[in-house]
Amino acid sequence: MDRKREPVRALELFCGIGGFAEAACEKADVVAAVDQSEIALSVYRLNRPSTPVKGFNLETVSPAVLADFNADMWWLSPPCQPYTVRGKCRDLEDSRASSLRRILSILPQVRPFSLGLENVEGFAASEARNLLVSVLKSCGYRIREISLCPTRFGVPNRRPRYYLFASLGELGEMDEAKISEYSMRDFLDGRPSPELALPPGIVERFGRGLPTLDPDDRNAYAACFASSYGKALMHSGSYLVHNGGLRRFSPDEILRFHGFPAAFKWPPKLGLRKRWHLAGNSLSVFVLRRALSILPHFK
């Protein structure tokens, strides 16, 4: 009789609202989730009350603290702003890259068996990526880098991202079959809130420049939702034709595009704009669940 494999002990760094935990829930035991944002951690706690949640600054974390988690793998979703045009592409000179640099300085001393990282596509051409790969190779890791988008798996949301997987063991292959043939309506609220509607004056002034979608167009896909959605009008996501005008997508709809479960909850007092921010900052559970199969623990 085959013995059931024990769940991998995973340390979720820059955890946000818990995208990695959702993607890895069947095969991983998250021993701790770490983030600086207390608001993000409040969402994480609400949905995963049994997971230890730690709010501390990774820029100054010690090797002993990370070693004490005794994790088989580390998952990293570090800040993307240093590698985006809006973030001025300052790369490792950006102070928001300091936490990643600190973790990489510790890695040779702790060396988890596996490691995974997700970031914007611009990370692939960054000095941060070069440093990451250099450190991993010096520690003897096997490395796989890949660019993936939910549209590749049949999800109508364009969100291309850079992924890196590294392990001291053998790396596997990813199942690239489509998850499903989704349509736009599969992700929409049954009764959208009236507060999602764009004011008529905004539509009249900017409507032609906004990426708009017809919910009944089976070929339509939403643009990447950024953390600025709901705050910045342009270059932050798509808008939906609705009741003769346009409306924003709700945070719950964005989470459905990401693959979060229907049972996922927001703290009752958390405002709409902050929900948009956290949803836009999160990762694609759909994509990561497939991509994790590259690592030995998730085959």
Residue ranges and their predicted role:
Residues 42-68:
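S-adenosyl-L-methionine
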Residues 199-299:
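C-terminal target-recognition/interaction regions appended to catalytic cores
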